[in-house]
């Protein structure tokens, strides 16, 4: 229906791209429009809280891009407002709703007790060449709560949480730039009898993969969870390959889910998802604290 940007020129481009009816360069004006009942926030990370709060206080439901907010205090405040106003508040994290995630969970049951998981999600940023020339954009400065862990690692954390739960001990070591964020790093999440390590980087190329090692076999997702097309798994003494291409686009499943529970007015289901998002945000906080970012 409507597109907002601080620049009306950019707002008009968004309007044309997505076939919206209106464009706004004032968030307040957009939020006063009675035809708008949902707002999707995809602004820099540090702006999520302020903009989401404005939307909720204006009576609008919110879908906010990952990472949800900078800390759990911000999330708790917005959950309180959303409950008081009976509004929906969702974190847009596509991997949680992909059919392939359920396929992966089922396969894990076939490889016995899992003891180790290794995940690599690295992606040479389209903005890194400019960064090397001294042009520092949002993703490479703490001013916008950015960095590799927040931008790419958040996918790793949600996946780890979905597969294994919250964890007990957390550590992270990052390559911290002069602007206070990690441009690459590796983390470790420990459980009672399981160790999960992950890498996320925005300054280098790599094969992306997920390797889950069990006592009776292993699983290798050939790529990151949202883009991989096949899974290799060893079980019962045999090496197998499984096609995991989804029928629909990456974002179809999460927005179809949001639509369904909104139409059912299922605020309890929304609360369940908010609890999951808070758990992952707590993990992110602990990892950042371990390396002082």
Q: For each predicted feature, which ranges?
A:
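Contiguous beta-strand/loop segments that form the cofactor/metal-binding neighborhood of enzyme cores
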Residues: 156-227, 256-264
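Predominantly a Rossmann-like dinucleotide-binding segment in NAD(P)-dependent oxidoreductases
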Residues: 98-168
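Active-site loop of classical SDR/Rossmann-like NAD(P)-dependent oxidoreductases
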Residues: 6, 244-256, 272
């Amino acid at each position: 229906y409507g597109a907002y940007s601080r620049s009306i020129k950019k707002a008009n481009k968004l309007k044309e791209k997505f076939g919206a009816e209106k464009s706004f360069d004032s968030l307040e004006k957009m939020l006063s429009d009675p035809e708008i009942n949902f707002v999707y926030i995809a602004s820099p990370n540090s702006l999520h809280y302020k903009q989401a709060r404005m939307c909720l206080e204006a009576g609008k439901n919110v879908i906010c891009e990952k990472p949800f907010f900078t800390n759990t205090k911000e999330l708790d405040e917005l959950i309180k407002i959303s409950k008081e106003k009976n509004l929906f508040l969702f974190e847009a994290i596509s991997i949680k709703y992909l059919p392939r995630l359920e396929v992966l969970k089922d396969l894990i049951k076939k490889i016995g007790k899992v003891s180790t998981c290794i995940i690599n999600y690295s992606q040479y940023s389209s903005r890194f060449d400019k960064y090397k020339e001294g042009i520092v954009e949002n993703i490479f400065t703490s001013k916008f709560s950015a960095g590799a862990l927040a931008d790419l690692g958040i996918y790793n954390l949600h996946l780890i949480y979905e597969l294994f739960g919250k964890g007990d001990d957390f550590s992270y070591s990052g390559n911290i730039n002069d602007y206070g964020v990690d441009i690459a790093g590796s983390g470790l999440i420990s459980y009672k009898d399981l160790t999960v390590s992950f890498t996320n980087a925005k300054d280098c190329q790599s094969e992306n993969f997920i390797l889950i090692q069990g006592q009776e076999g292993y699983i290798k997702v050939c790529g990151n969870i949202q883009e991989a097309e096949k899974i290799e798994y060893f079980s019962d003494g045999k090496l197998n390959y499984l096609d995991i291409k989804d029928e629909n686009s990456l974002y179809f499943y999460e927005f179809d889910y949001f639509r369904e529970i909104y139409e059912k007015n299922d605020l309890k289901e929304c609360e369940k998802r908010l609890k999951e998002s808070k758990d992952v945000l707590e993990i992110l906080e602990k990892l950042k604290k371990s390396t002082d970012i």
